[in-house]
Protein backbone atom coordinates (compact mmCIF):
# COMPACT_ATOMS: atom_id res chain seq x y z
CA UNK A 1 0.00 0.00 0.00
CA UNK A 2 3.05 2.26 -0.22
CA UNK A 3 1.82 3.27 -3.66
CA UNK A 4 -1.18 5.06 -2.09
CA UNK A 5 1.20 7.27 -0.11
CA UNK A 6 3.26 7.96 -3.24
CA UNK A 7 0.10 8.89 -5.18
CA UNK A 8 -0.99 11.26 -2.40
CA UNK A 9 2.47 12.89 -2.29
CA UNK A 10 2.57 13.35 -6.07
CA UNK A 11 -0.93 14.84 -6.12
CA UNK A 12 0.15 17.14 -3.29
CA UNK A 13 3.18 18.29 -5.29
CA UNK A 14 0.97 18.95 -8.30
CA UNK A 15 -1.63 20.87 -6.29
CA UNK A 16 0.97 22.93 -4.40
CA UNK A 17 2.55 23.97 -7.69
CA UNK A 18 -0.85 25.00 -9.05
CA UNK A 19 -1.67 26.96 -5.88
CA UNK A 20 1.63 28.82 -6.33
CA UNK A 21 0.72 29.56 -9.95
CA UNK A 22 -2.76 30.80 -8.99
CA UNK A 23 -1.26 33.05 -6.31
CA UNK A 24 1.62 34.41 -8.38
CA UNK A 25 0.94 34.22 -12.13
CA UNK A 26 -2.70 35.14 -12.68
CA UNK A 27 -2.04 38.88 -12.65
CA UNK A 28 1.33 38.82 -14.46
CA UNK A 29 0.45 36.09 -16.98
CA UNK A 30 4.04 34.98 -17.61
CA UNK A 31 7.45 35.03 -15.94
CA UNK A 32 10.45 34.38 -18.19
CA UNK A 33 12.90 31.97 -16.57
CA UNK A 34 15.07 31.80 -19.71
CA UNK A 35 13.78 34.50 -22.04
CA UNK A 36 12.03 33.11 -25.14
CA UNK A 37 13.02 29.57 -24.13
CA UNK A 38 11.28 28.66 -20.86
CA UNK A 39 8.59 30.70 -19.12
CA UNK A 40 6.10 30.08 -16.35
CA UNK A 41 2.85 31.08 -18.04
CA UNK A 42 -0.64 30.96 -16.53
CA UNK A 43 -3.14 29.16 -18.77
CA UNK A 44 -6.66 27.96 -17.99
CA UNK A 45 -6.99 24.72 -19.96
CA UNK A 46 -10.61 23.72 -20.49
CA UNK A 47 -9.75 20.85 -22.82
CA UNK A 48 -7.16 18.14 -23.27
CA UNK A 49 -3.65 18.21 -24.61
CA UNK A 50 -3.16 20.40 -27.68
CA UNK A 51 -6.42 22.21 -26.98
CA UNK A 52 -8.58 19.25 -27.96
CA UNK A 53 -12.13 18.74 -26.69
CA UNK A 54 -12.53 22.20 -25.18
CA UNK A 55 -15.32 22.54 -22.57
CA UNK A 56 -16.04 18.80 -22.34
CA UNK A 57 -15.23 18.45 -18.63
CA UNK A 58 -17.42 15.39 -18.03
CA UNK A 59 -15.42 13.32 -20.52
CA UNK A 60 -12.19 14.07 -18.66
CA UNK A 61 -13.75 13.46 -15.26
CA UNK A 62 -15.08 10.04 -16.32
CA UNK A 63 -11.79 9.03 -17.99
CA UNK A 64 -9.76 10.10 -14.92
CA UNK A 65 -12.02 8.15 -12.58
CA UNK A 66 -11.96 5.05 -14.78
CA UNK A 67 -8.16 5.20 -15.10
CA UNK A 68 -7.85 5.52 -11.33
CA UNK A 69 -10.21 2.63 -10.55
CA UNK A 70 -8.64 0.37 -13.16
CA UNK A 71 -5.10 1.29 -12.09
CA UNK A 72 -5.78 0.66 -8.41
CA UNK A 73 -7.53 -2.62 -9.22
CA UNK A 74 -4.57 -3.72 -11.33
CA UNK A 75 -2.05 -2.79 -8.63
CA UNK A 76 -4.06 -4.70 -6.01
CA UNK A 77 -4.73 -7.86 -8.02
CA UNK A 78 -1.60 -8.41 -10.12
CA UNK A 79 2.08 -8.88 -9.56
CA UNK A 80 3.47 -5.93 -11.52
CA UNK A 81 7.10 -5.19 -12.43
CA UNK A 82 8.46 -1.87 -11.13
CA UNK A 83 8.07 -0.19 -14.55
CA UNK A 84 4.40 -1.09 -14.64
CA UNK A 85 3.87 -0.12 -11.02
CA UNK A 86 5.57 3.28 -11.48
CA UNK A 87 3.67 3.86 -14.71
CA UNK A 88 0.32 3.20 -13.08
CA UNK A 89 1.19 5.30 -10.02
CA UNK A 90 2.25 8.26 -12.19
CA UNK A 91 -0.80 8.03 -14.47
CA UNK A 92 -3.18 7.88 -11.49
CA UNK A 93 -1.40 10.81 -9.82
CA UNK A 94 -1.55 12.95 -12.95
CA UNK A 95 -5.14 12.04 -13.74
CA UNK A 96 -6.31 12.84 -10.20
CA UNK A 97 -4.23 16.04 -10.04
CA UNK A 98 -5.93 17.39 -13.15
CA UNK A 99 -9.30 16.00 -12.03
CA UNK A 100 -9.08 18.03 -8.82
CA UNK A 101 -8.59 21.17 -10.93
CA UNK A 102 -11.52 20.36 -13.22
CA UNK A 103 -13.89 19.76 -10.32
CA UNK A 104 -12.64 22.63 -8.15
CA UNK A 105 -11.99 25.29 -10.79
CA UNK A 106 -13.74 24.16 -13.97
CA UNK A 107 -10.39 24.07 -15.82
CA UNK A 108 -6.86 22.73 -15.44
CA UNK A 109 -4.08 25.12 -14.42
CA UNK A 110 -1.14 24.87 -16.85
CA UNK A 111 2.12 26.77 -16.51
CA UNK A 112 5.23 25.12 -18.02
CA UNK A 113 5.90 27.00 -21.26
CA UNK A 114 8.89 25.74 -23.30
CA UNK A 115 8.51 28.29 -26.11
CA UNK A 116 11.57 27.29 -28.05
CA UNK A 117 10.37 23.73 -28.75
CA UNK A 118 6.67 23.53 -27.91
CA UNK A 119 3.73 25.87 -28.32
CA UNK A 120 1.59 24.21 -25.67
CA UNK A 121 1.64 24.96 -21.95
CA UNK A 122 1.40 22.05 -19.51
CA UNK A 123 1.75 21.16 -15.81
CA UNK A 124 3.35 18.60 -13.50
CA UNK A 125 0.30 16.31 -13.65
CA UNK A 126 0.69 16.19 -17.45
CA UNK A 127 4.35 15.21 -16.99
CA UNK A 128 3.26 12.44 -14.61
CA UNK A 129 0.82 11.07 -17.21
CA UNK A 130 3.35 11.17 -20.06
CA UNK A 131 6.22 9.63 -18.07
CA UNK A 132 3.80 7.09 -16.59
CA UNK A 133 2.65 6.12 -20.07
CA UNK A 134 6.27 5.62 -21.18
CA UNK A 135 6.92 3.40 -18.13
CA UNK A 136 3.70 1.48 -18.78
CA UNK A 137 4.72 0.91 -22.41
CA UNK A 138 8.13 -0.39 -21.29
CA UNK A 139 6.35 -2.70 -18.86
CA UNK A 140 3.92 -4.03 -21.48
CA UNK A 141 6.60 -4.47 -24.16
CA UNK A 142 9.32 -6.05 -22.05
CA UNK A 143 8.04 -7.33 -18.71
CA UNK A 144 4.29 -7.98 -18.68
CA UNK A 145 4.37 -11.52 -20.07
CA UNK A 146 7.20 -12.45 -17.65
CA UNK A 147 5.24 -11.32 -14.59
CA UNK A 148 2.32 -13.66 -15.24
UniProtKB/Swiss-Prot annotation:
EC number: 3.4.23.36
One term of GO molecular function: aspartic-type endopeptidase activity
Residues annotated as the enzyme's active site: 110, 126
Localization, UniProt: Cell membrane
Primary residence: membrane
GO BP: proteolysis
Membrane topology according to the record: Multi-pass membrane protein
Transmembrane annotation, as ranges: 57-77, 80-100, 124-144
One GO location term (cellular component): plasma membrane
Pathway: Protein modification; lipoprotein biosynthesis (signal peptide cleavage)
Keywords: Aspartyl protease, Cell membrane, Hydrolase, Membrane, Protease, Transmembrane, Transmembrane helix
Catalytic activity field: Release of signal peptides from bacterial membrane prolipoproteins. Hydrolyzes -Xaa-Yaa-Zaa-|-(S,diacylglyceryl)Cys-, in which Xaa is hydrophobic (preferably Leu), and Yaa (Ala or Ser) and Zaa (Gly or Ala) have small, neutral side chains
Job of this protein: This protein specifically catalyzes the removal of signal peptides from prolipoproteins.
Family according to the record: Belongs to the peptidase A8 family.
Name by which UniProt lists this protein: Lipoprotein signal peptidase
Gene: lspA
Amino acid sequence: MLYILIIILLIGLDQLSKIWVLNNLVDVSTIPIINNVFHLTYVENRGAAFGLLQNNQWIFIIVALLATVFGLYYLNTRKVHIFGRLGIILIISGALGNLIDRVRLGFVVDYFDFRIIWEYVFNIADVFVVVGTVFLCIYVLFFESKSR
